A protein has these predicted regions:
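Acidic, histidine-bearing metal-coordination/catalytic regions of metal-dependent phosphoesterases
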Residues: 1-4, 8-14, 134, 147
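Residue-level marker for buried hydrophobic side chains located in beta-strands
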Residues: 2-4, 33-34, 184, 223
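Active-site-proximal loop/helix segment associated with metal-binding centers of metalloenzymes
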Residues: 93, 107-200
Length: 248
């Protein structure tokens, strides 16, 4: 069995048996995929350990693509392993980060993964710790009602957007399967869907790349998160948030 869900942001209540009773029939061979903003590797220290240990104790394997709210510095410290034909960061034996641009073969189906998204909650700036005016700017923003800002390497990471090497890796791996997969799992959506979701959304290099995938690739379903809703955009594109849906 394979299930997919949306953003967790470090809140894993949905995986408790009373909310996800299907797990009673699952084993570690079965997989639940989070479509970004996993948030389980957030502090990058011992504060993450209890939640990660609890996730490892669940009867299934939990995998996730990255979102725009992840601690990339901490994620990159985990070992890279090969898993079902693609690369993962192994957070725990059965808690895995599905890296960008990979094609995994799971239960006989091909899954293409491309995590990441551009943060839109930074209108008041991205503060840089260690600069002379950091404390002053932070204090001003803390006093401002509904301020939307982030702090570099504490609550925002430039790696939220893929590198050129990751785009190249994605195209290379898609070419190996003739741009034909069964499922696409991303955090944000292709440009035409992203612009439809919210008038404040803007195209960016990642949404444009995903638009290229949408137009070039052959796939059955595309599941994504990021926009905090649960609904079918059309017969092939599914936006997820709290829901956990079975795909295989």
């Amino acid at each position: 069995m394979i299930f997919v869900t949306g953003d967790c942001h470090g809140n894993f209540e949905r995986f408790k048996p009373k909310y996800f009773p299907e797990q009673a029939q699952m084993t570690k061979r079965d997989i639940v995929i989070c479509a970004g903003d996993f948030g389980g590797v957030w502090f990058g220290d011992g504060r993450d350990e209890a939640a990660l240990d609890w996730l490892e104790s669940l009867p299934f394997t939990l995998a996730f693509v990255c979102g725009n709210h992840e601690n990339y510095d901490a994620l990159e410290r985990y070992p890279v392993k090969d898993w079902h034909g693609g690369k993962v960061h192994r957070i725990r034996s059965h808690v895995l980060h599905l890296m960008r641009g990979q094609v995994f073969e799971l239960e006989g189906y091909h899954f293409f993964t491309m995590g990441g998204a551009k943060s839109h909650d930074t209108e008041d700036g991205i503060l840089e710790p260690g600069t002379p005016d950091f404390e002053r700017k932070l204090l001003m923003l803390q006093r401002k009602p509904r301020a939307r800002y982030r702090i570099n390497h504490i609550s925002w990471w430039a790696q939220e957007m893929p590198s050129e090497e990751e785009y190249a890796e994605a195209r290379k791996n898609l070419a190996k399967v003739d741009w034909a997969v069964d499922y696409v799992i991303t955090h944000c959506a292709p440009t035409n869907i992203a612009l439809m979701e919210n008038r404040h959304n803007e195209a960016d290099p990642l949404t444009d790349f995903l638009q290229e995938v949408k137009e070039r690739a052959h796939y059955h379903y595309w599941l994504f998160g990021h926009y905090h809703d649960n609904r079918a955009i059309d017969e092939k594109h599914i936006l997820l948030w709290e829901q956990i849906v079975q795909v295989i």
